[in-house]
């Protein structure tokens, strides 16, 4: 490639020189010195190692965060489980108490029905007594 570049330069120098501003001149491409390449490679590997270390550290931190979140979630679910167990126990107690009160509630319902029937009988008796009173007053006036 260097030989081709030299050939191009030689061809251009044989041409008559122009003062045209659009014409560009080429310079010979030089390979960097061996020490520069070695230093650049070391620098590249050092920066790549720093980059990869950062990426791995970030990934590791993400996994630690997920682990902590999972632990907290697990604790919350354990708390919720305990609460649900307590609620279930309390509901069973309430159901037992309700079952114990059920005969009394049934008696209350029966008494309520009897009171309603007695009230209807009282209204009928009141209406009948008013009719009797009206008849009595009518007979008394005669």
Swiss-Prot record:
Keyword Ribonucleoprotein: no
Coiled-coil residue spans: 79-127
Residues covered by region (Disordered): 1-33
GO cellular component: axon cytoplasm; BLOC-1 complex; BORC complex; centrosome; cytoplasmic side of lysosomal membrane; cytosol; gamma-tubulin complex; mitochondrion
Function: Component of the BLOC-1 complex, a complex that is required for normal biogenesis of lysosome-related organelles (LRO), such as platelet dense granules and melanosomes. In concert with the AP-3 complex, the BLOC-1 complex is required to target membrane protein cargos into vesicles assembled at cell bodies for delivery into neurites and nerve terminals. The BLOC-1 complex, in association with SNARE proteins, is also proposed to be involved in neurite extension. As part of the BORC complex may play a role in lysosomes movement and localization at the cell periphery.
Assembly and interaction partners: Component of the biogenesis of lysosome-related organelles complex 1 (BLOC-1) composed of BLOC1S1, BLOC1S2, BLOC1S3, BLOC1S4, BLOC1S5, BLOC1S6, DTNBP1/BLOC1S7 and SNAPIN/BLOC1S8. Octamer composed of one copy each BLOC1S1, BLOC1S2, BLOC1S3, BLOC1S4, BLOC1S5, BLOC1S6, DTNBP1/BLOC1S7 and SNAPIN/BLOC1S8. Interacts directly with BLOC1S1, BLOC1S3, BLOC1S4, BLOC1S5 and SNAPIN. The BLOC-1 complex associates with the AP-3 protein complex and membrane protein cargos. Component of the BLOC-one-related complex (BORC) which is composed of BLOC1S1, BLOC1S2, BORCS5, BORCS6, BORCS7, BORCS8, KXD1 and SNAPIN.
Protein name: Biogenesis of lysosome-related organelles complex 1 subunit 2
Annotated source species: Homo sapiens
Source organism phylogeny: Eukaryota, Metazoa, Chordata, Craniata, Vertebrata
Name of encoding gene: BLOC1S2
């Amino acid at each position: 490639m260097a030989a081709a570049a030299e050939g191009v330069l030689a061809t251009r120098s044989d041409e008559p020189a122009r003062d045209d501003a659009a014409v560009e001149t080429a310079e010979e491409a030089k390979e960097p010195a061996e020490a520069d390449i070695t230093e650049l490679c070391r620098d590249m590997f050092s920066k790549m190692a720093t980059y990869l270390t950062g990426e791995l550290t970030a990934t590791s931190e993400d996994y630690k965060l997920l682990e902590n979140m999972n632990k907290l979630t697990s604790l919350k679910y354990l708390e919720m489980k305990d609460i649900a167990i307590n609620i279930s126990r309390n509901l069973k107690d309430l159901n037992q108490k309700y079952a114990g009160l059920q005969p009394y509630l049934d008696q209350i319902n029966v008494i309520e029905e009897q009171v309603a029937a007695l009230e209807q009988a009282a209204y009928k008796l009141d209406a009948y007594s008013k009719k009797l009173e009206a008849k009595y007053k009518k007979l008394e006036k005669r």
